Design a protein with these regions (language model features):
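Long, hydrophobic/aromatic-enriched structural stretches that serve as scaffold segments
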Residues: 67, 73-74, 81-84, 95-96, ...
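Assembly/oligomerization scaffold segments
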Residues: 1-82, 165, 230
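Short, acidic/charged, Gly/Pro-enriched secondary-structure junctions
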Residues: 31-65, 96-100, 104-105, 236-259, ...
Length: 285
């Protein structure tokens, strides 16, 4: 595509979806002299390269919308095969073994960084649904460089430089806070307890009582919840910021305090301006 014909390009992904999505709008008025050469059709391959020629998206056109002024195409990468294919049978083993079996059935290579053990069964589920049950909610499932990747959170957080931040919408809540948890037996006797003393001092006590089902002390610790922090941040364009990564910011006046997981990203090229929008969830300290 010739750049003057492009009105906008958006490239994004969320943790709840397996596929990255690219949307591009091509103006018909400046494009009509060579639009026939583009021959854009559903199923066509779409590649997006950065300024250095590195491929940052490879997928195919799934939707085309035309009006008198523009043509908008929507393309997905190979992650779409995880949501558009239902699988059947019983899947059992470690998360890695299940992911490997699914990747083999779909003809996609597997790459991962260590998944925990689980057993998944059930016919008629999408490949993405089975993978999500196998590896848990906190892991990023994607197809990168042609390979199925399942990555866990953690690792270094990228500092958000204040001079690069364009817009912030933040939210903090203690509506789901649990700062004391008690595990009881059949007779009501306390078997284990855990608490966050600092949160109790600052916010008052919010207690949860749980019946025993496993290791009582581990149950009590797992039930504790701190305040929740979330944000939507727009920064100057940065392709290195993407779903599954982490950022860090300490700007209480913006509602940003600490380390955040990136749960969704959208890179936008519009009217000559490149920006990146991030959906963030605070990481408990």
């Amino acid at each position: 595509m010739v750049m003057p014909a492009l009105e906008s390009v958006r490239l994004g992904k969320t943790r709840n979806e397996a596929a990255a999505c690219l949307t591009a709008t091509v103006l018909i008025a400046p494009a009509d002299t060579y639009f026939l050469k583009l021959s854009v059709a559903v199923g066509d391959v779409v590649r997006l390269l950065d300024d250095g020629g590195k491929e940052i998206f490879l997928g195919s056109v799934h939707e085309l919308d035309r009006d008198p002024e523009a043509v908008t195409l929507t393309a997905y990468d190979r992650g779409v095969y995880l949501t558009r294919n239902e699988l059947y049978g019983v899947y059992a083993g470690t998360g890695r073994q299940i992911a490997g079996k699914i990747a083999g059935e779909l003809g996609v290579p597997l790459e991962d960084d260590g998944l925990y053990r689980t057993i998944v069964t059930g016919p008629g589920e999408s490949a993405f649904s089975i993978l999500r049950r196998a590896v848990g909610e906190g892991r990023e499932i994607a197809v990168r460089d042609g390979a199925l990747t399942v990555t866990k959170g953690g690792g270094g957080a990228v500092p958000l430089s204040p001079e690069r931040v364009l817009e912030v919408f933040g939210r903090a809540s203690m509506g789901n806070m649990v700062n004391r948890a008690v595990v009881t037996g059949r007779n009501g006797r306390i078997l284990a307890a855990a608490q966050n003393t600092g949160d109790i001092t600052a916010c008052g006590r919010f207690q949860r009582v749980i019946g025993k089902s496993g290791d009582p002390q581990a149950q009590a610790k797992a039930a504790l919840r701190r305040r929740s922090l979330s944000a939507r941040v727009t920064v100057l364009g940065d392709l290195s910021l993407r779903c599954g990564g982490r950022v860090e910011a300490h700007r209480p006046q913006w509602g940003l305090e600490g380390v955040y997981d990136i749960t969704a990203h959208e890179h936008r090229w519009e009217k000559g301006v490149f920006t990146t929008s991030l959906s963030l969830e605070g990481v408990e300290g």
